[in-house]
């Protein structure tokens, strides 16, 4: 086998593994972004723990088929970049959606969230969700509210008794 074919097979295997391992994968068309805008986007994604790569569509198609995500192939036309996140489902959608609001050249095409193909509208809906940490803090405040209210009520009763006794 030639060295070129071996290299391409390694890339296909790498993409397929990333597709299988990632909780969230978003495909975007980056045509029209300047170098500085693309660098800014990569920096924002890196800070959010998201990997952003450009692969050849033919290699990505083969990888999607081997990862049993062949439905993604219809979106692999033109210049594409793929954002992979192994930790946070919301992070790539949020960063890409926020960046696309300010830079019309970036077009979100589709995504795969936990193995399920999602459309542009679904990606935008996911982008509006709070992050995992945000959801946990909301849950924590909801769980603490009854205890806090009980403590405040007890303190109010104690203050009232103290006033009556004085």
UniProtKB/Swiss-Prot annotation:
Pfam family, one: Ribosomal_L10
GO cellular component: large ribosomal subunit
MF-aspect GO terms: large ribosomal subunit rRNA binding; structural constituent of ribosome
Coiled coil: none
Keywords recorded for this protein, A-Z: Ribonucleoprotein, Ribosomal protein, RNA-binding, rRNA-binding
GO BP term, pick one: translation
Domain of life: Bacteria
NCBIfam families documented for this protein: PRK00099.1-1
Family: Belongs to the universal ribosomal protein uL10 family.
Database matches in PANTHER family: 39S RIBOSOMAL PROTEIN L10, MITOCHONDRIAL (PTHR11560)
Function summary: Forms part of the ribosomal stalk, playing a central role in the interaction of the ribosome with GTP-bound translation factors.
Subunit and partners: Part of the ribosomal stalk of the 50S ribosomal subunit. The N-terminus interacts with L11 and the large rRNA to form the base of the stalk. The C-terminus forms an elongated spine to which L12 dimers bind in a sequential fashion forming a multimeric L10(L12)X complex.
Name of this chain's protein: Large ribosomal subunit protein uL10
Organism: Bacillus mycoides (strain KBAB4)
